[in-house]
């Protein structure tokens, strides 16, 4: 029951969940708001968060392997754990940096809603899945008029013979073609 458990749980469950949420927000932001988030701030946010997460949790793995127990608020009573005081200070500094990186994300999010570069195309990522066939800022029911018919698997990436590496789900299959 050491710091290894804390580090491993948070790097696997916590960090992966947050990166999934951030990826979804960056990906669907143009569809939700009709604008793009700032790319430069997005890259800074990603690299600070990525590096910071590992600067927090890899030293905790090391402390856990060295036998440092979790759920203790003060390690000064044990001489063997005093060697980790500077490492714990380093972890705290890394956590503060990661916190400020999240503030950068929040600023990027809200500023981009009003001042982000306008998304002028319906499908900026060239994604074949159905949600990108709706207009930007879709109204009630998502699609104006008739609901589109799905003919393909949502991730059917392949050359359509015209230089496109994707074919939307709504494109009918050609004769002899199969959806994978």
Q: What residue ranges belong to the model's regions?
A:
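Juxtamembrane membrane-water interface segments of multi-pass membrane proteins
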Residues: 1-5, 20-46, 59-84, 107-127, ...
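Hydrophobic alpha-helical transmembrane segments
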Residues: 8-18, 83-101
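Divalent metal-coordination and catalytic microenvironments
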Residues: 10, 51, 61, 106
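Hydrophobic membrane-spanning alpha-helices of multi-pass integral membrane proteins
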Residues: 14-19, 46-57
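Juxtamembrane/interfacial segments around transmembrane helices
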Residues: 19-29, 58, 97-106, 140-154
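A broad, low-specificity signal marking well-ordered, structured residues that form hydrophobic/aromatic
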Residues: 49, 104, 130
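Extramembrane terminal tails and long inter-domain/linker segments of multi-pass membrane proteins
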Residues: 66-83, 112-180
């Amino acid at each position: 029951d050491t710091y290894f458990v804390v580090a491993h749980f948070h790097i696997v469950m916590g960090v992966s969940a947050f990166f999934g949420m951030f990826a979804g927000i960056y990906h669907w932001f143009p569809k939700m708001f009709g604008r793009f988030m700032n790319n430069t701030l997005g890259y800074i946010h990603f690299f600070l968060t990525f590096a910071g997460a590992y600067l927090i949790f890899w030293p905790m793995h090391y402390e856990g392997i060295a036998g440092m127990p979790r759920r203790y608020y003060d390690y000064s009573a044990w001489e063997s754990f005093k060697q980790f005081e500077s490492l714990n200070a380093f972890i705290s500094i890394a956590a503060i940096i990661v916190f400020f990186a999240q503030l950068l994300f929040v600023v990027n999010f809200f500023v981009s809603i009003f001042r982000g570069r306008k998304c002028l195309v319906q499908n900026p990522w060239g994604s074949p899945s159905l949600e990108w066939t709706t207009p930007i800022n879709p109204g009630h029911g998502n699609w104006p008029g008739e609901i589109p018919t799905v003919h393909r698997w949502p991730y059917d990436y392949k050359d359509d013979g015209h230089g496109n590496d994707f074919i939307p789900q709504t494109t009918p299959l050609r004769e002899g073609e199969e959806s994978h």
